[in-house]
Amino acid sequence: MADLLSDAEISDRLPEEWTREDDEIVRVFEFDGYLDASGFLSAAAGLAEDAWHHPEMTIRWGEVEVRLTTHDAGGITENDIDLAERLNGIHD
C-alpha cells in the first residue's frame, strides 16, 4: 500500500491547475466540445488502467472533472500526484 503524503508534501507537489479538496486532488479539464472531452476521457482511462489507479471522472459538455485519491491508503499518495501529472501531459 502507498504511503499518505503529508500536507506539506501535497502543497509542494500539487501539479498545476489541480486543487486539494479534503482527501482528493481535483481538476476540471476544459475542451471545445463534447467529442474533445470524450476523447480526453478515453485517453485518461487508458493512463489510469496502465497505472492501475482509477480516478473518479465526470464528463460534461466541454469539460471533464477528475478526482484522485488512493482509497486503500485513505487519502492522497504519490500515485495520485503521478497520475495527475500524466493527465496534465495529455491535456496541456
UniProtKB/Swiss-Prot annotation:
Belongs to the pterin-4-alpha-carbinolamine dehydratase family. One of its GO terms (molecular function) is 4-alpha-hydroxytetrahydrobiopterin dehydratase activity. GO terms for biological process: tetrahydrobiopterin biosynthetic process. It is an enzyme of class 4 (lyase). InterPro entries: PCD_sf (IPR036428), Pterin_deHydtase (IPR001533). CDD domains: PCD_DCoH. The keyword Iron-sulfur does not apply. This is Putative pterin-4-alpha-carbinolamine dehydratase. It comes from Haloarcula marismortui (strain ATCC 43049 / DSM 3752 / JCM 8966 / VKM B-1809) (Halobacterium marismortui). Its EC number is 4.2.1.96. It catalyses: (4aS,6R)-4a-hydroxy-L-erythro-5,6,7,8-tetrahydrobiopterin = (6R)-L-erythro-6,7-dihydrobiopterin + H2O. Keywords: Lyase.
